[in-house]
Regions:
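Hydrophobic ligand-binding cavity/cleft-lining segments
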Residues: 2-67
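Hydrophobic pocket/interface hotspot
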Residues: 29-30, 77, 123
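A general secondary-structure signal for short beta-strands and their flanking turns/coil
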Residues: 9-15, 54, 72, 103-105, ...
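Generic short beta-strand segments
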Residues: 55-64, 89-95, 125-126
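Hydrophobic-ligand binding "helix-grip"
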Residues: 71-118
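Solvent-exposed residues in well-ordered beta-strands and their adjoining turns
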Residues: 19-23, 62-64, 80, 113-115, ...
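A conserved amphipathic terminal alpha-helix motif
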Residues: 136-177
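Beta-strand/loop substructures that line and gate deep hydrophobic ligand-binding cavities in soluble
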Residues: 99-148
């Protein structure tokens, strides 16, 4: 039991803001944000997204390598709407194919809000995990810096997708409605 209590815990976070100018139909943005499955599918890779019910999704985050370990995060995402806003947050998380880590916790709190000129949003992504035994010789600060860099990369990828795909999807939705 002693070894379990001596595990080194690592924690890292990343934050991104987004400001999207919408040229046409800005008044329809609040209604568009109510289309949860459509909006979440435009923000994330729809090939890795599985609807679980109203306001609930499973998402297989793009896998990545950290010091020769293949990391495959899988998260359950909750989605809520409030006035002119859509919020996404992680309700559950685990790592597929990495039995070495049993205390992985991924957090996400992302909000996208309809404004007069378009959409504004912010996402905070965080991870808390014990230092895997295979990586015990690597200084924790180096692991945390690497983890923070990976999270920033994930958020930048999502931001790029949102900037490109969300406006296209919104315009398509406007044509359909």
């Amino acid at each position: 039991m002693l070894s379990k209590s001596l595990k080194m815990s690592l924690a890292f976070t990343a934050r991104q803001k987004i400001d999207l100018v919408v040229q046409n139909n800005q008044e329809k943005l609040p209604d568009y944000l109510l289309q949860q499955e459509r909006v979440v599918g435009a923000m994330l890779d729809p090939e890795k997204l599985t609807p679980l019910g109203p306001g609930r999704f499973k998402y297989e985050v793009t896998s990545f390598k950290v010091f020769q370990l293949q990391i495959n995060p899988v998260v359950s995402i909750g989605v809520e709407n409030s006035e002119k806003k859509i919020r996404m947050y992680v309700t559950e998380s685990h790592l597929d194919g990495l039995g070495l880590v049993d205390d992985f916790d991924l957090t996400l709190d992302a909000v996208l809000e309809a404004k007069l000129s378009g959409l504004e949003g912010e996402a905070l992504l965080g991870v808390t995990v014990s230092q895997p035994h295979l990586l015990r010789l690597i200084p924790p600060k180096m692991l945390e810096k690497t983890g923070q860099s990976i999270l920033n990369g994930i958020l930048l990828g999502i931001k790029a997708r949102v900037q490109k795909q969300l406006i296209v999807d919104f315009n398509n939705w406007c044509k359909e409605n």
